[in-house]
Design a protein with these regions (language model features):
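N-terminal targeting pre-sequences for secretion and organelle import
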Residues: 165-191, 263
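Hydrophobic h-region of N-terminal signal peptides that target proteins for export
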Residues: 7-18
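Extracellular or lumenal secretory-pathway regions
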Residues: 19-121, 127
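Short polybasic amphipathic segments
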Residues: 111-115, 182-185, 202-205, 259-262
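Bacterial N-terminal signal peptides that target proteins for export
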Residues: 1-7
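Residue-level detector of beta-strand face positions
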Residues: 69-70, 112-114, 134, 141, ...
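Acidic, glycine-rich flexible loop segments
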Residues: 103-171, 288
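A sequence-level detector for low-complexity, Ser/Thr- and acidic-rich stretches
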Residues: 20, 36-38, 54, 58, ...
Length: 318
């Protein structure tokens, strides 16, 4: 191998090794957490008791399902459900009779997370599981397409997860009450929300004439701007990821399901439109009004969708 080619190969390999994956943190708050243990054999009796129930302390091989409500993500109101299907083995290096011996403590389960925006629209799903925390994130859909990573959890000692019999009516879970806790996701995404870039900078346009925001035509406080963005997640109506958004024929635009936020120098901007860009594949339109009082100069702009922030971009402001 030519020494110059070898040098380039080694340099590129070193650069790839040096690159660290970008990790996104989601702090997910859940409430009304109830674990239903399969302590009743008769199917006719399952879910039939409208009253608060108790259950037996499980030995190994006890199956159960936990159901929780997602109420917030990163401090912002959200909706959704978290469901765990588990096999209680009670692994322990020093097991009591009826427990499973192992070199670690815990059990194992498979978790399913279904995230919704405040208005109930679908944002994304995450699948994870493991023998004990941290659980392994196995994948995702929607805004979390192909996500990997892990999660841990922080219990609330004042409101632990409630254990119930599978005979209890699950339609009354919120009325009867349950526990609450926080799950900390650390995700590596296949793609992240981003502001599209051009050779002259971010693809952010003046709404009055569709010219590019640049040093000769900077943005102004209070001005309406239009951003070209990518990776904002599912829309209504739904459009497959590899298909163009519908042509605009005067009908309402295809709207992004997740909450979309824009900040300029940390100040929130008013988002007026969050939609698929007609006839384009994977490009979204975000119309926003510049906040008042933005300091002239180069301003840091950041886009957030599905609680995932973009990298900051810089735009000139006068």
């Amino acid at each position: 191998m030519n020494w110059k080619i070898a040098f380039v190969f080694v340099a590129c390999a070193a650069a790839l090794v040096a690159q660290k994956p970008r990790v996104v943190t989601l702090n997910v708050d859940v409430e009304n957490a109830v674990t239903y243990r399969f302590d009743v054999e008769d199917p006719a009796k399952r879910g039939a008791n409208p009253n608060l129930t108790t259950t037996i302390l499980p030995n190994a091989f006890m199956e159960g399902i936990e159901v929780d409500d997602i109420v917030a993500v990163n401090g912002k109101p959200a909706k959704g459900v978290h469901a765990i299907r588990y096999m209680r083995m009670n692994f322990s290096p020093t097991p009591s009779p009826g427990q499973a011996i192992a070199d670690m403590s815990g059990s194992f389960g498979d978790c399913n997370w279904y995230f919704q925006a405040q208005d109930g629209k679908f944002v994304g799903q995450i699948l994870d599981g493991g023998l004990t925390v941290p659980h392994v994130v196995k994948g995702g859909a929607g805004a979390f397409y192909a996500a990997t990573g892990e999660h841990n959890w922080v219990p609330d000692p004042a409101r632990p997860t409630r254990n119930a019999s599978v005979s209890e009516d699950p339609s009354r879970r919120r009325e009867l009450g349950g526990g609450r806790y926080r799950v900390l996701f650390y995700l590596v995404m296949e793609s992240y929300p981003e502001v599209e870039m051009t050779s002259q900078g971010p693809a952010i346009l003046h709404a009055d004439d569709w010219s590019l925001v640049n040093p000769t035509r900077p943005a102004r406080a209070g001005e309406l701007l239009v951003m070209r963005a990518r990776n904002l997640g599912p829309t209504t109506p739904a459009v497959p990821p590899n298909q163009p958004f519908p042509k605009w024929t005067g009908d309402p635009l295809v709207v992004v399901n997740s909450d979309v936020e824009v900040t300029v120098n940390g100040a929130p901007a008013e988002v007026l439109v969050k939609a698929g860009w007609p006839s384009e594949v994977g490009v979204y339109r975000v119309d926003f009004r510049m906040p008042s009082g933005v300091t002239p100069g180069m301003a840091a702009l950041q886009l957030t969708a599905a609680w995932i922030p973009s990298e900051e971009v810089k735009i000139p402001v006068r």
